């Protein structure tokens, strides 16, 4: 309902699940009821029989082209070319590598925050090494993914809009690599710190809308909701 209330022209979802055994209409039918008649979607994992996780873009305007971007066999972006009257622009719906923490990792972090002295134990030191390597691996993978997207952005035949979940902060290499030459909608019209992640880690801004200089941002909003540990953004 909150998407319907926003009356958006284009909606980019980085993760949504369709369960084949549930008696529910597919997402494209739901969005058509919001006048978002055009869509493109791609599954992260092609062989899931019960539930499939998708990245998807829904639009009030015609979509004339769809491109998947993969890095190390992982889907990291869905590109769509959208036609508005006589103009075409390219939307990058992006979902970069996460740090892939599991429940055990989060429990370790909570325990470490509550009792710093516990980090001296052998088991806690082993757990801290696992955390370090996951963070390091995430940074390295996002850096490569960002460079790949940068190359595609620079060769785009149309003005671009880049949006999505970068899983990284505004100080990161990934953010600055992708943002080069683009305008951050939050920096133009946002207010406050702009945090979009409210999970078990420190609150940070990891979701972005970046615009080609041809576009002018009129407003930016973080949409408060409780169905996820990340907030939705609107520009």
Per-range role (PLM):
Residues 15-17, 132-139, 161-164:
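Second-shell loop/turn segments in exported
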Residues 22, 72, 134-148:
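Soluble or luminal CAZymes and related metallo-dependent hydrolases
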Residues 93-138:
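Active-site-proximal loop/helix segment associated with metal-binding centers of metalloenzymes
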